[in-house]
A protein has these predicted regions:
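C-terminal charged capping/lid subdomain of soluble metabolic enzymes
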Residues: 180-182, 284-357
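Generic secondary-structure signature for well-ordered alpha-helical cores
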Residues: 90, 156-159, 165-172, 180-192, ...
Length: 357
């Protein structure tokens, strides 16, 4: 994997050894009063043994562990971490290092942004999804019940360390979840990158690192042009309007098998692409190809008519809605997204019929 640093909005994204140097140099220069490492039950066991030996500092260090998984990305967990920081002696000169997937980096960034009106933090994404998605853009926060990401602020870390050694700690389904966002970046921004992702199974394993960096570059360029999501940045929500609703539905209904974020977004992308055919004249053959490519990585899920109705109701709570309207990102062509598309609800049912066929 290339080690060229990527300049983001007021911070940088460092790769592998450069990330280690960045963290050690920053701690030596700033001399925070105390270090806090936020981990979950998985990264405490699997990722800290990779991270800690490279941390060169004599500054006091505390580890705060939260339970892993999306169901714990909520205000109750934030409160637990705020209390832990307070009881362990954190002050405004402390530094929080968030080591984990998107739940840890999103929630940890929000905790840091609000504790004592804001302390410094660094993100160390350990899942593929967090590396290519949560590493860029400064979005922090948590869920409100089963409603995704309704609470939060935009606040940038001091820096991000992407270390591909952590990928070896991930189960296969977590790797696939991250690939969904990589496929998305190609579909909304780069036909060439989409074609590379289509050939992923034929590429040598070490090439994944190149694709990760390119995915970060794509998202970073979108965020750089539109940091507050007034226009272009909305394109990153492709597949997410229905994807988030599907993910929320599974969280609300534990009798259903839980879907990871990327798994739900992959379904959302198939649905959004079919809606693009219906609403914008996107080529049906290309839609079928996108569906087939994603089906190689994401097994088809079943949905009853009643479940589809419930999912559509959840979609009304999407934080991107305005004035009661549900807005979609659709495709005019691969690499040519269109934002703020209003779609008739009956078309959404037809999209599910297409997905299930």
């Amino acid at each position: 994997m290339g080690t060229t640093t990527i300049e983001a909005q007021n911070y940088c994204i460092y790769f592998n050894e450069e990330g280690t140097r960045f963290i050690n140099d920053l701690i030596a220069e700033r001399r925070p009063s105390k270090l806090f490492l936020l981990v979950d039950s998985h990264t405490n066991e699997h990722c800290l043994p990779v991270f800690l030996p490279d941390l060169a500092t004599d500054i006091p260090l505390e580890i705060i562990e939260i339970e892993a998984g999306e169901p714990n990305k909520n205000i109750d967990t934030c409160t637990q971490v705020w209390y832990a920081l307070s009881e362990l002696g954190a002050d405004r000169k402390s530094l929080l290092i968030n080591i984990g997937g998107g739940v840890v980096t999103d929630l940890g960034g929000f905790v840091a942004s609000t504790f004592m009106r804001g302390i410094d933090f660094i993100n160390v994404p350990t899942s593929l999804l967090a590396m290519v998605d949560a590493s860029v853009g400064g979005k922090t926060g948590g869920d409100l019940g089963a409603l995704k990401n309704l609470i939060g602020v935009i606040n940038n870390p001091l820096g991000v360390m992407v270390d591909t050694r952590f990928l070896a700690t991930l189960p296969a389904e977590e790797l696939r979840s991250g690939m969904a966002e990589m496929f998305k970046h190609g579909l909304i921004s780069s036909p060439e990158y989409w074609q590379q992702m289509c050939q992923l199974n034929e590429l040598p394993a070490e090439y994944l690192g190149v694709l990760i960096r390119e995915s970060v570059v794509i998202k970073n360029e979108v965020v750089r042009q539109d940091p507050t999501e007034k226009g272009l940045r909305k394109t990153l929500n492709y597949g997410h309007t229905l994807g988030h609703a599907i993910e929320s539905y599974c969280l609300q209904n534990p009798e259903r098998e839980r879907l990871l974020h990327g798994e739900a977004v992959a379904i959302g992308m198939v649905l959004a692409t079919y809606l693009s055919v219906r609403e914008l004249g996107f080529p049906q053959a290309e839609c079928d190809h996108i569906k087939a490519v994603l089906a190689e990585y994401f097994p088809k899920q079943s949905f009853s008519n009643e479940e589809i109705t419930d999912i559509c109701q959840l979609m009304r709570f999407d934080k991107k809605n305005v004035g009661g309207n549900v807005y979609f990102v659709l495709l005019e062509a691969i690499g040519k997204p269109k934002i703020d598309c209003i779609v008739p609800f009956e078309e959404i049912y037809k999209a599910f019929e297409y997905y299930l066929s």
